[in-house]
Amino acid sequence: MSLIPRIFGDRRSTSVFDPFSIDVFDPFKELGFTVSNSGETSAFANTRIDWKETPEAHVFKADLPGLKKEEVKVEVEEDRVLQISGERNVEKEDKNDTWHRVERSSGKFMRRFRLPENAKMDQVKASMENGVLTVTVPKEEVNNPDVKSIEISG
């Protein structure tokens, strides 16, 4: 295991040409510099989400430490789009408080994914446990066509 961080991502990085990703292209994302629509540069605004496909479903996982399920929205839109969003508010400051360090992220995030044709959009389920959001989108069963062998004469 390397102690040097990978600058250009890892084997699971999303391809720029991924037909299912509809996030806004950010050329500085892999270098650790980000540009956010809201002007925020927090890590929270750039929440990373894993998407894996199993034989039965598409499964999305997001680490959202410190968020309650009421602060997270999972929505499905027309045209097979899954949208995951949330907001963590900035802690209220008291004039008598002296801050020595502020490292926790706050702000909003929103990620959108276009799902393939086999997604059952009417059966999406979401759960949140220990700060990990899991969204499961079942897949349609694929009917394997009957294959008939043809005898070759000659």
Curated annotation (Swiss-Prot):
GO terms for cellular component: cytoplasm. It is found in: Cytoplasm. InterPro entries: A-crystallin/Hsp20_dom, HSP20-like_chaperone, Small_HSP. It holds the Pfam family HSP20. Keywords: Cytoplasm, Stress response. The keyword Cytoplasm applies. Residues 40-154 form the sHSP domain. Forms oligomeric structures. PANTHER family: HEAT-SHOCK PROTEIN 20 FAMILY MEMBER. This is 17.6 kDa class I heat shock protein. It comes from Solanum peruvianum (Peruvian tomato).
